[in-house]
Regions:
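Generic transmembrane alpha-helix motif of multi-pass integral membrane proteins
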Residues: 11-27, 31
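Interfacial segments of multi-pass membrane proteins
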Residues: 24, 37-42
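Hydrophobic alpha-helical membrane segments of integral membrane proteins
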Residues: 29-34, 49, 53
């Protein structure tokens, strides 16, 4: 039994980042419900007890990361999903992905270890961080390819404002 190891490519972290960046606070209830109901379909009800708290920390990691990047003014972000994407948008998303993955890997595992009374090693935290970053990159790459194909087939139009 290897215990809790985390995912090496965790796609939902990319969903958290994209949905919060584009839709703001309005996305949080839907993201939270997805966080707690998705795993409960796979595992038993016991899973729901401690994951509700861990899900809150995962979502707060993204919120805090967005606020840190906004506060630092390292990059600005175009908050309209229909406008043309530029380098500043990618830079903003990359910073949010890295910072939120770091916070998520540390604080979610801290909460899980406190509630479950188990020690979680540094390799698990590193695996969470790598999984969140890689999953976000895969998710965003998929969206870029999909929207590019939709635009080429004239099923989607970019506003130039």
């Amino acid at each position: 039994d290897k215990g809790w190891i985390g995912s090496i490519v965790y796609l939902p972290h990319g969903c958290r980042v994209i949905f919060y960046c584009f839709f703001g606070v309005r996305a949080l209830p839907a993201l939270y419900l997805a966080e707690i109901t998705g795993p409960s379909l796979v595992w038993d009800e016991k899973y729901l007890d401690y994951w509700t708290y861990a899900s809150i920390s995962s979502l707060l990691a993204v919120v805090v990361a967005v606020e840190i990047v906004k506060w630092s003014r390292v990059s600005t972000f175009n908050y309209n999903i229909l406008k043309k994407v530029n380098f500043a948008n990618y830079k903003f998303l990359i910073f949010v992905i890295i910072i939120s993955a770091l916070f998520n890997s540390i604080f979610t595992n801290l909460i899980l270890s406190i509630i479950n009374g188990v020690n979680i090693g540094v390799e698990v935290i590193a695996r969470f961080f790598i999984g969140d970053v890689l999953g976000s990159i895969v998710f965003i790459t998929f969206l870029m390819i999909m929207f590019n194909l939709l635009q080429q087939r004239r099923l989607y139009k970019v506003h130039e404002d």
